Amino acid sequence: MNDNNNLFERGQKTKVLNLFAGLGGNRLKWQNVEVTAVEFEPKIAKVYEDNNPNDTVIVGDAMEYLKKHRNEFDFIWASPPCQKHSKMMKATRHDVADFFDLQLWQVIIFLSHFFDGSWVVENVKPYYEPLIKPQKELGRHLIWSNFDITDFEMPNIKNFITQGTTKETEKFKEWLGIKYEGNIYYKGNHCHKNY
C-alpha cells in the first residue's frame, strides 16, 4: 500500500483523473487539484463542466481513456456504473434482472497492476458478495484503494430512490453538492452512466 494520505497537501497541484465523472458530486471537496474528468454522456458532461469550469472534461469512454492516459496523473478516482451492482437490482418492482457490469472489477485489477500512482475506486454495496474485498465500507458505499484512508463521517441519505419524492431527490443533490435543476435520473441512470 502506498502512504499517500498527504497527496493533496503537498505544495503543487495534484493531477487527478476523475473517471465515470457523472455530474461531479464526488469532486466537490477536492482542493489544490488539476482535474481531467471523463464522462460518456454529453448532457451529463455539460452539467459537470458547468459546475466545475476549471476542470478539463472529456466526453468519451472512461476505460479507454484510462488505458491510454493513466501515467499522466498522480491520482485516479473511479466510480464505475453502479446500477447493475446495486441491491436495487433485486429490490425493484420491475423485471430488470441482468448481469452485473465487469467494469468495476476490471478497473480495480487494472489500477492494481498498471498504475504506480494513488487511486480510489468507489461503488455501492452490491447485491452479491464483492469479488474483491474492499478496503473501506462507508454508508452504502464500498471503497477500494492502494493507500490507507482515514475513517470519516459520511452522511447517508436514506430512501432517496425508493421514496422517489422531490424532497428526497433535493436532499440527495444537496448531499452530493450537485447544482442542477433537471432530473438527475437520466437514461435510466442517476448521476452518471458510463457513468
Q: In which residue ranges do the predicted regions lie?
A:
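S-adenosyl-L-methionine-dependent nucleic acid methyltransferase catalytic domains
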Residues: M1-K15
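Intrinsic low-complexity, intrinsically disordered segments enriched in polar/basic residues
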Residues: N2-N6, Y48, K90
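Intrinsically disordered, low-complexity coil segments
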Residues: F8-Q12, E49-D55, H94-F99
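Residue-level preference for short coil/turn positions at secondary-structure junctions
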Residues: Q12, Q31, P53, H69-E72, ...
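SAM cofactor-binding core of SAM-dependent methyltransferases
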Residues: V16-L66
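Short His-Asn-centered micro-motif
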Residues: L19, V38-E39, G60, A78-S79, ...
